[in-house]
């Protein structure tokens, strides 16, 4: 959030598509795999005309097109999550794919904590992009992404658990 603005005053675009809930863990982690990001542009204050409509900020995130020459696999392990990304050609120099998935592993450490200090939280997300090059200047892209946060909250009265499973996602076909 920028300048104290809420989600309705800050816009996040993923390849030109608005993302309405852009983060996990109260927006500490973005809902897209960092290995899949080609570039990101942040606008604060004055925005280009096509991006008007928000008063605090606009962030444009563009995903990579898959590698058009060879198949590539990437595995990333860091503190909050593990991710994998696959990319490569379907038709060399014409049609490529990029698929990335990520899962937090904070919940795996719960068994090390006492019952009252457990996090009881996990996140998942995926990004995929299919790109077809008609010419050097014309490309058709199909994009999908999805994200999920699982919260398991213990109720103190009877020891039961309540699960809150918000789901966010956009599909373009």
What feature does the model see in each segment?
Residues 42, 60, 74-78, 98-102, ...:
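Transmembrane beta-strands of outer-membrane beta-barrel proteins
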Residues 55-57, 71-73, 80-84, 124-128, ...:
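Hydrophobic, lipid-facing positions within transmembrane beta-strands of outer-membrane proteins
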Residues 63, 77, 88-90, 132-134:
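Residue-level signature of outer-membrane beta-barrel architecture
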Residues 31-74, 83-85, 94:
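A beta-strand signature from Gram-negative outer-membrane beta-barrel systems
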Residues 1-21, 38:
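Extracytoplasmic beta-strand/coil segments of soluble accessory domains associated
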Residues 17-44, 128:
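Short acidic/polar hinge/loop motifs at secondary-structure boundaries
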Residues 10, 36, 69-73, 91-97, ...:
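Outer-envelope beta-barrel architecture signal
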Residues 117, 138-173:
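Flexible loop and strand-edge segments within Gram-negative outer membrane beta-barrel domains
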